[in-house]
C-alpha cells in the first residue's frame, strides 16, 4: 500500500471511530464548553512501555479541527515510564474533550502491542529468527496493529489474503494433498508470489519440500519433530514455527534454527499501555 493510499485508509478508519463515538453531539462537552475556547491538555504515561501510534493520536485531533496541534516529548519506539510527560495537545477545548477517548484508544492499543512485541523480540537477540505477526487482528484495526508490531521490533507476515499464498489444513483438504495444494497454488498465483504451507507432521514436511514450497510452517509440532524437520528441509525452504508461542518458550524455539516465529498473541493478547490526558487548561482566562 503506497503512502497516499495508506493515509486515505487511516483517515477513513479514524473518522469512522470518531463518528461511532460522537454520532450527533458530545453532550457532556457541549454542556460545559458551548463555544470555542483555546486550551491545552497533557499526555501522561501511567505505566512503563514502548510508545507507538503518535501520528494516529495527533491525526485524530487534526481531523476534528485542522488547527489542533500536538507537541511530543518522545518518538514512536521510545521507552516511557509511569509518570513521564509524553506530550501536549493544543486546540479548541471542545475538540480536546471530544477527541480524547478515540485518540487514546489508538495510542494505548498500539503502544500495548509495541510493548508486548518488544518484550518477545528481546528474547530472540543473537539468533537469526525473526518474530512476525499474523492476521489475528482486531477488525478495522489491522493497519494500526501491524504498524505497532514493527515499531516494537517485530516484522509483518502477509498483510491480507491477497499478498501471499498460505495453505492451511482446510486448503490441503480441499485440494486433496499437500503436493496438489502447492501445485494448484503455483498454477494460479503469479510466479512472484510466495507459497507457504502449514505442516503438522514430518510426512507433510517431506511432501512440502519435494513439492517446492517456499516456506514451511510447523504448526503445533513437538520440539523434537521440528528439529528433525529442519534437518530434513536442509535449507531448501524457509521455516516458520507457530502455535502456543510465549515468552517462556520463544528462545528455545529460536535455538532450533527456524527462520521465523509467528505469534497471534502479538495482536490478540497484548494488554494496552495505560496513558492519560490530564490537566486541561483554558487559555482565554475566562
Residue ranges and their predicted role:
Residues 220, 243, 264-265:
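Short secondary-structure boundary segments
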Amino acid at each position: 500500500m503506497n503512502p497516499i493510499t495508506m493515509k486515505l485508509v487511516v483517515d477513513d478508519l479514524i473518522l469512522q471511530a470518531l463518528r461511532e463515538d460522537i454520532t450527533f453531539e458530545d453532550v457532556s462537552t457541549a454542556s460545559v464548553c458551548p463555544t470555542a475556547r483555546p486550551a491545552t491538555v497533557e499526555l501522561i504515561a501511567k505505566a512503563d512501555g514502548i510508545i507507538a501510534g503518535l501520528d494516529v493520536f495527533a491525526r485524530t485531533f487534526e481531523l476534528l479541527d485542522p488547527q489542533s496541534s500536538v507537541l511530543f516529548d518522545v518518538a514512536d519506539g521510545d521507552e516511557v515510564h509511569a509518570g513521564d510527560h509524553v506530550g501536549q495537545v493544543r486546540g479548541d477545548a471542545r475538540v480536546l474533550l471530544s477527541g480524547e477517548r478515540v485518540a487514546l484508544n489508538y495510542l494505548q492499543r498500539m503502544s500495548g502491542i509495541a510493548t508486548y512485541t518488544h518484550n518477545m523480540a528481546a528474547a530472540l537477540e543473537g539468533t537469526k529468527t525473526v518474530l512476525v505477526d499474523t492476521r489475528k487482528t482486531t477488525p478495522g484495526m489491522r493497519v494500526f496493529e501491524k504498524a505497532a508490531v514493527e515499531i516494537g521490533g517485530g516484522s509483518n507476515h502477509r498483510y491480507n489474503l491477497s499478498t501471499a499464498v498460505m495453505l492451511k489444513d482446510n486448503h490441503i483438504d480441499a485440494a486433496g494433498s499437500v503436493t496438489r495444494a502447492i501445485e494448484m497454488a503455483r498454477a494460479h498465483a503469479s510466479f512472484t508470489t510466495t507459497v507457504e504451507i502449514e505442516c503438522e507432521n514430518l510426512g507433510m514436511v517431506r511432501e512440502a519440500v519435494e513439492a517446492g514450497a517456499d516456506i514451511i510452517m510447523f504448526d503445533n509440532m513437538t520440539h523434537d519433530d521440528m528439529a528433525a524437520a529442519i534437518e530434513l528441509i536442509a535449507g531448501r525452504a524457509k521455516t516458520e514455527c507457530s502455535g502456543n508461542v510465549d515468552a517462556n518458550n520463544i528462545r528455545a524455539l529460536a535455538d532450533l534454527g527456524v527462520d521465523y516465529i509467528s505469534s497471534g498473541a502479538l495482536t490478540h493478547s497484548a494488554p494496552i499501555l495505560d496513558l492519560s490526558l490530564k490537566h486541561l487548561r483554558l487559555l482565554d482566562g475566562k
